[in-house]
Amino acid sequence: MANIEIRQETPTAFYIKVHDTDNVAIIVNDNGLKAGTRFPDGLELIEHIPQGHKVALLDIPANGEIIRYGEVIGYAVRAIPRGSWIDESMVVLPEAPPLHTLPLATKVPEPLPPLEGYTFEGYRNADGSVGTKNLLGITTSVHCVAGVVDYVVKIIERDLLPKYPNVDGVVGLNHLYGCGVAINAPAAVVPIRTIHNISLNPNFGGEVMVIGLGCEKLQPERLLTGTDDVQAIPVESASIVSLQDEKHVGFQSMVEDILQIAERHLQKLNQRQRETCPASELVVGMQCGGSDAFSGVTANPAVGYASDLLVRCGATVMFSEVTEVRDAIHLLTPRAVNEEVGKRLLEEMEWYDNYLNMGKTDRSANPSPGNKKGGLANVVEKALGSIAKSGKSAIVEVLSPGQRPTKRGLIYAATPASDFVCGTQQVASGITVQVFTTGRGTPYGLMAVPVIKMATRTELANRWFDLMDINAGTIATGEETIEEVGWKLFHFILDVASGKKKTFSDQWGLHNQLAVFNPAPVT
């Protein structure tokens, strides 16, 4: 990230220029700035510009480059005078970087000095992983059983959990897959692998139980066996419930069967205790949603700094969201630790390009109305801000959707950019904590892992004071530095992972349903 230049007219009027070569800046003031506002460098606004939106720092000719983050984010539809507001309608989307010409592993970052002595209180698992929660996860093989599972979860919470105080909760791992799908299609590997690996998330302590219907395409046995690139889950048949089993006479018979199995697993989970673990055992997912023009200059760079701190501790950090990386991929492939990892990055980008082409769309469909209201002109500008979450470390591994990492360090886990789908896929990839930045605001949360939400703007942090865990808006006004907020986030991650602090999402019980990525046909 280049040095951020903050210019002000009065103590309450600022603009931020990210890179020396930028010919645009964003307005910081909560209510925007009015026409006639002057800055010490002679810039005068010729019209009102909303907060987060771009101002032309120079006269930009028609078809001229519009530059932010030191990169071309688009071309001017018409001549844009200095001091003008540049909204998305004035920016022509450039072509995506061609994949076959990108440099691979040409600027591999040197490892940063290791950080030692940082720990958290986690739950050690038999497979060597460490959880940050102690949850009973109830896996489902098909959506048909979701209503029954939800019913049973309520009974478990009411009648069983009070008997097992060391268990944090119970999660029905419902999804929309399992039947009415092309189960043998090549792309079916993605949802099957995802559901399989969700059940192995470290926060479920290795206790796997599966509820199926009986006639579904994704039979529990096939789900547990998984795909060629995963290890089969050795689950005793007593932990699988088929609702169509002839022994079930009436609904309550099904319920009692599930409750008996759940209690056996709760007894085992209740024996687990937190213990001191090195920070290297953490697996942290980084995500953004409801992004705005501040995301790439406040919250995401702070997350990137915290990411580097975690990598220096030996931890595993994942960033994702293919369409919010694709237009900045030329800045990531040089950071691949070797050419093989660089090629894997390109493979995932190309796979998603083809996936979008099949739907007769492209990456331009990514930005939402909220992104644009927050000052983002297009997916290029959004991507350049999004990758700031990755910090400066070398990328050591690339995962296809739902795969689990085999290395520690900075990892790219390919997922769609949808908040819910990305979160679900990262849970499958084994994250135990997630950091989520937002500029527009979202109550998003996950039951499986604690979600730390970071606001890009102070106005949002103040207005949603009991939903945003950390405020990065102080970076925009110069009250704090990226490094200071990054350290604050780092320590907060350790506290949340230890159970010493609860995220607002967990305090309020704001948890989204899982959304498994299924690129295969639905029949």
Swiss-Prot record:
Any GO MF annotation of the entry: protein homodimerization activity
One Pfam family of this chain: SAF
Induction of its expression: Induced by galactarate, D-glucarate and D-glycerate.
Keywords: Iron, Lyase, Metal-binding
InterPro entries for this protein: GarD-like, GarD_Enterobacteriaceae, GD_AH_C, GD_AH_second, SAF, UxaA/GarD_SAF, UxaA_altronate/galactarate_dh
EC number: 4.2.1.42
Chemical reaction(s) catalysed: galactarate = 5-dehydro-4-deoxy-D-glucarate + H2O
Biological-process GO terms, alphabetical: D-galacturonate catabolic process; galactarate catabolic process
Listed cofactors: Fe(2+)
Pathway it works in: Carbohydrate acid metabolism; galactarate degradation; D-glycerate from galactarate: step 1/3
Subunit structure: Homodimer.
Family: Belongs to the UxaA family.
PANTHER family registered for this protein in UniProt: ALTRONATE/GALACTARATE DEHYDRATASE, GALACTARATE DEHYDRATASE (L-THREO-FORMING)
Entry text on domains: Consists of three domains. The N-terminal SAF domain, which forms a beta-clip fold, is likely involved in the substrate recognition. It is connected by a long unstructured linker to the second domain, which serves as a dimerization interface between two monomers. The C-terminal domain represents the catalytic core of the protein and probably contains the metal binding site.
Protein task: Catalyzes the dehydration of galactarate to form 5-dehydro-4-deoxy-D-glucarate (5-KDG).
Protein's name according to its UniProt entry: Galactarate dehydratase (L-threo-forming)
Lineage of producing organism: Bacteria, Pseudomonadati, Pseudomonadota, Gammaproteobacteria, Enterobacterales
